[in-house]
Amino acid sequence: APPLDAPESLQMTQVSSGWFNAGLDPLGRNKLVPTVSFRLQNTTDDTIRYVQLNGVFRRQGEEEEWGTSYVHAFGTEGLDAGSSTIEFRLESERGYTGEQARDEMLAHSGFVDVTMDLFVKHRGDQWVRLDSIDIDRQLLTQ
């Protein structure tokens, strides 16, 4: 089978993003981590099988990774033509910590916004970037 053209075959839908309260760090400070939720829709006429996802987070203006989040999207069961997956939720293990209230952290002058690039791997093919999401500067409660 020819390699899957992921950007032409899979589409991110129902995308939402923000900063999730990851609780307290070992020093008792609030920790916020960037989080993206979405579904994938199969926009082809065929069933697609064996897809893995990797979200790569970066602070805007920086090259280095600021956390990754991997998920095995689906295997042999596949994703039928035109249908959508369950909701996936990718969050970085890295985030911001602060003594101040969480909403104050988002307004802090040192706060740098974060972007997540979503990469897709089909079977044994190379990872391909599917989309890029700027994380909304909002608090997520769940």
Please describe what each predicted stretch is.
Residues G28-L32, T47, L106-G110:
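A generic structural micro-feature
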Residues V15-F20, L53-R58, E91-G95:
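Generic short beta-strand segments
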Residues L40-T44:
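Asparagine-centered strand-capping/turn motif at beta-strand->loop junctions
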Residues D45-E64:
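Short acidic, flexible loop segments centered on an aromatic residue
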Residues S16-D25, S37-R39, S69-G75, E99-R102:
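Short structured motifs
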Residues T68-T141:
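Short, solvent-exposed, Trp/other aromatic-anchored flexible loops in extracytoplasmic proteins
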Residues A1-T35, E62, I133-Q142:
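Low-complexity, acidic Ser/Thr/Pro/Gly-rich terminal tails and inter-domain linkers that flank the onset
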